């Protein structure tokens, strides 16, 4: 109830496009545990996250009480995982009762922030910390296993509604009532949205012009640039 009141207040005072405030519905962390969604093949994951109380330290590698079972899910360029609560509705016909927050193991469940409106290099204040959009999210088979939705990973990837990651530029404490305050928007010459990169990476892998646009973005992680260069090389050799 307290979180819902906070969100109502944030929607009232920080309407979309006003004050550069992006309401956060929940901030969540999780520990690695054994999950038995498939009795034949238990999996180790920190997918099931819960909201924390009080304040928590956000370091260059993520929240102090958050863990990742797979090394590629974390690191300095994937310190904070974000997902829009608005996109939960894409799966309302697949799941009887949609989770209230952290449906896909994200740290920040945003009230409504479309991937078309999120650019790599955007910087936000979150509590005492400053974060920057740095990576797309590549949906993992574990979320498909959890919900038992056929082709969930493919559906999410092709839609472009994957959520995204942020790196931490300034460490600091974060509390549940904190929201994202836009400090800087990526520059026009190299502006690239999460939706655009998802479309390139998942749906348009042989478009060399678009691949070049993405490769030249100064804010993407080195690993993402490597993957894009490999796609370009394959496209040119076809």
Question: For the regions a protein language model found, what residue spans apply to each?
Answer:
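Double-stranded beta-helix
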Residues: 143-161, 165
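Short, small-residue-biased leader/transition segments that mark boundaries at the very start
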Residues: 1-7
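Electropositive, beta-rich accessory/interaction domains or terminal extensions
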Residues: 13-145, 151, 186-238
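Short alpha-helix capping/helix-loop boundary micro-motifs
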Residues: 110, 163-170
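Loop/turn positions that initiate beta-strands
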Residues: 121, 171, 175-178
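Short hydrophobic beta/alpha edge segments that flank linear recognition/processing sites
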Residues: 179-184
